[in-house]
């Protein structure tokens, strides 16, 4: 089979950096999908992406389709002649050309023909065109007088098989083998002589590294080295690194300075200004303090680097001066004095203003504080003030600083440290893997705020549907569960949901407790799935409806401890045996008339069950409880070996059924292990 490497490069104006990887992945996926549809084989695929180009290299692409036997099934041989003639005509042949074949138990007319495989070079134009058009673009652009759309205007197109150009015209561009280097330095235009050497040629001729991940690691190493040169430690945010990588083709990292006077501004504000506006990396000294130095990555090798550094220093000086101004202006007004402004900020239609929300948070934070042992006064105070920073200049400019700046402003206002910390951390966890609030008061406010949002929005019928979650309630619910589980808070979730609903807006359906609880349980399922917990373990615990997510977690941990434990597997089988006996009976009790028992084995089981019940029913040491149940198994087995449950004596039968129902209740005190098949 003859093969050649196929190169596709689409040259564009600067692509949106935050979606460059997504575009590259879609570009590659769509192309390989179309090649697969054409049954064209290849050995491997490489994706390349820079700010000005998307490229794919398909190695050892089959140069011609294999010949195929095309077969069409027609009417049965007993069909009307006109139907058979019509089928033959649709195939472009006479009736006598059709063949008869048995399909199932019936004979049908079939038309078969051999279709010669087409040359790949003749298929690539339409294949590439479809691949490009199928890229999902939220905000497409039009340019020139062309009736085409793309994320940015396109300027050149390379399509090559080996060293040969594939003739094509796509989006008004004629294919060729000419690419472009950097805009302002080096070779501006040059040819790709061979598809497989694409990456090498661009690197040698224009110093452009087209592989995204390779370029990313180059930037990482350069940033680390620049930090070392400044006797500092670079803080590399992966999302910022991805964005910077999507902004440069020829990365050259350098450092610049800003006045140390700006260090009087909270460091989070300085870092946010450097990251969001300038795409700078910040540096810390050996003690972890922010240094008045930044690292930027240029897209050019300059003979006069000082000019670039000076320009960046002037820009960051202006940005940090703005942050300093916001900080000074905001401190002139207390958080409490801003409460009235929150009445003009809409939280959500039907749920009132932010002013309404903080009143609910204040009350609910105080309640939760009493339950978890936090300071009630500080928790309520933090709940009242936790949203005031939303109307400050700093948070208006840097939305990611909400909460953080509130903590600083609280300290400036003379609020105590517990209140300030709770305000600062009440949004946590903000994303997967984020830290939890560190203080009890912060936990109380975080729970109150998140529950108010989740119950309110779902309570007015605006909860997530399918893949749509416009208010990020799934993430918020997961954060709530993480707080309760990882902070070891034994809180009754249904009770909290009910209380939150009753304190919410009058538009909220207070009867949606079960719906919200089930929503939370689906998020808990996702939480354990991410942790690779056997889904049967989750279902076994869910079946006994623990009131507290933390208690739920303790049960899951206990069951996980006994995975692949033969003694536990035997216990599961015993439980299933009991469940099978009891499934045909209703209205059974766990109160046993022991005076009706006659056999030694059943009396022994009664005595052991009574003793075990006292030890485990109020215990949350579920690992120990399971160990006790495993030790209990021999007594249960002895009972089944020596005693007939379904005796003719009605009173005795009822006593025995109640006894094994009592035994089953001990199993259910941990989980419904009938869901397990470990």
From Swiss-Prot:
Question: What GO molecular function annotation could you give as one example from this UniProt entry?
Answer: arginine-tRNA ligase activity
**This protein's name:** Glycine--tRNA ligase beta subunit
What EC designation does it have? 6.1.1.14
Q: Which organism is it from?
A: Ruthia magnifica subsp. Calyptogena magnifica
Q: Which family does the UniProt entry place this protein in?
A: Belongs to the class-II aminoacyl-tRNA synthetase family.
Relate the assembly described in the record: Tetramer of two alpha and two beta subunits.
Chief location bin: cytoplasm
User: Per its UniProt entry, which superkingdom is the organism in?
Assistant: Bacteria
InterPro entries according to UniProt = DALR_anticod-bd, Gly-tRNA-synth_bsu, Gly-tRNA-synth_heterodimer
Pfam short name (any one) = tRNA_synt_2f
Q: Which reaction does it catalyse?
A: tRNA(Gly) + glycine + ATP = glycyl-tRNA(Gly) + AMP + diphosphate
